[in-house]
A protein has these predicted regions:
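Gly/Gly-Pro-rich "capping" loops immediately C-terminal to redox-active cysteine motifs
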Residues: 228-260
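Short, internal strand/loop/helix patches
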Residues: 117-160, 268-275, 280
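Electrostatic cytochrome c docking/interface patches
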Residues: 194-219, 235, 318
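Structural microenvironment flanking redox-active thiols in thiol-disulfide oxidoreductases
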Residues: 80-124, 128-131, 135-140, 247
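C-terminal capping alpha-helices of c-type cytochrome domains
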Residues: 137, 141, 160-171, 184-195, ...
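Short active-site neighborhood of thiol/selenol oxidoreductases, capturing the structured segment around
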Residues: 55-77, 83
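A short beta-strand-turn-helix
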Residues: 42-62
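The canonical Cys-X-X-Cys-His
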Residues: 73-76, 163, 215, 219-229, ...
Length: 319
């Protein structure tokens, strides 16, 4: 409670509260959320370089910050896969106009070497740094960044998949879900940082959005960051024809509890884990009904793509 009384809390600013923006002009916000608030603790990058959190990673920069750890079986792989898509969508902006910062909450395991391998698995490019350090320093950073949660203390897998977007020079901060739609996150950053991403169109020209059922929504929101159906492998395998290659019971169990199936050293799960650079499929906590609907929909999409025999042949050779 001592810190809460002595330091202003980030709540309004970090949530992008309009009232706070009106009360505190940009100069005042920048002073409020600057060197006196953010810790300048030392951290170590995936390349083994020692950096200081405020001076080297925040000061004078626009950033997107999240917490991860490489042994995570829940949201972390999905978070990182989604950010990888955002990185591609933003293109040259990353590393120039905005910097991605992913901090491990498992520093005893996540050495610079482990983080470097993890970054490579998810195709992290320039402008995206992965960090480790002392646990007490990481806890302080997480708290001051508004990324700490009560569930973190009980279980790392319970940590909140939040993404803190900030403009340090102006003192403006906003929290988003790190597992949101990548196009939405990219557009949110572009708007927040006032980038010109090309000519805007009138709403009158907008296409009518198609009705989306539960299964396609689940695939787009949970699976599409790593998988395609008929467009080749990504971070994970192409799912074209997977409902024909795998027994339905095995597929349902693997989708529902991939961490358990892998821990049992299932030969198919182990072969996929090794083939796709040891990227863990996250446990998305899907219900049996959601899993069943997803399998049916993937099968339907595979049949609709039936003309793509070249893709099906390639996928048939997978373990």
């Amino acid at each position: 409670m001592r810190d809460i009384r002595e330091k202003p809390i980030l709540v309004a600013a970090l949530l992008g509260c309009a009232a706070a923006a009106l009360v505190h002009p940009p100069a005042a916000r920048a002073a409020r959320w600057g060197a006196d608030y953010f810790p300048n603790v030392p951290l170590v990058t995936q390349d083994g370089k020692v950096v200081h959190f405020y001076d080297d990673l925040l000061k004078g920069k626009r950033v997107a910050v999240n917490l991860i750890y490489t042994r995570c079986t829940a949201s972390c792989p999905l978070e990182t896969a989604k950010l990888s898509q955002v990185q591609r969508l933003l293109g040259a902006h990353v590393g120039k106009d905005v910097f991605f910062v992913s901090i491990s909450i498992d520093p005893d395991h996540d050495t610079p070497e482990v983080l470097k391998a993890y970054a490579q698995k998810f195709h992290a490019g320039p402008g995206w740094v992965f960090l480790t350090g002392k646990m007490e320093d990481i806890r302080l950073v997480a708290k001051r960044m508004g990324l700490a949660s009560l569930t973190d203390a009980a279980s790392r897998d319970g940590h909140q998949p939040s993404l803190m977007i900030g403009n340090e020079p102006t003192g403006e901060w906003m929290r988003n879900s790190a597992v949101d739609n990548p196009q939405f996150l990219a557009a949110t950053m572009a708007n927040f940082f006032h980038w010109n991403m090309g000519p805007s169109k009138s709403y009158a020209e907008a296409r009518e959005l198609p009705s989306v059922g539960q299964a396609p929504y689940l695939f787009r929101s949970r699976c599409a960051a790593c998988h395609t159906i008929g467009n080749g492998p990504g971070i994970g395998p192409d799912l074209q024809g997977v409902t024909e290659r795998r027994q339905r019971g095995w597929l349902a169990r693997y989708i529902a509890k991939p961490d358990v199936v892998l821990a049992e050293k299932d030969p198919i799960a182990t072969a996929l884990f090794e083939q796709y650079r040891s990227v863990r499929m996250p446990n998305l906590d899907l219900s049996s009904g959601e899993v069943s609907d997803l399998i049916d929909w993937i099968g339907e999409q595979s049949k609709a793509n039936g003309a793509r025999t070249d893709v099906a042949v390639k996928n048939a050779a997978m373990p």
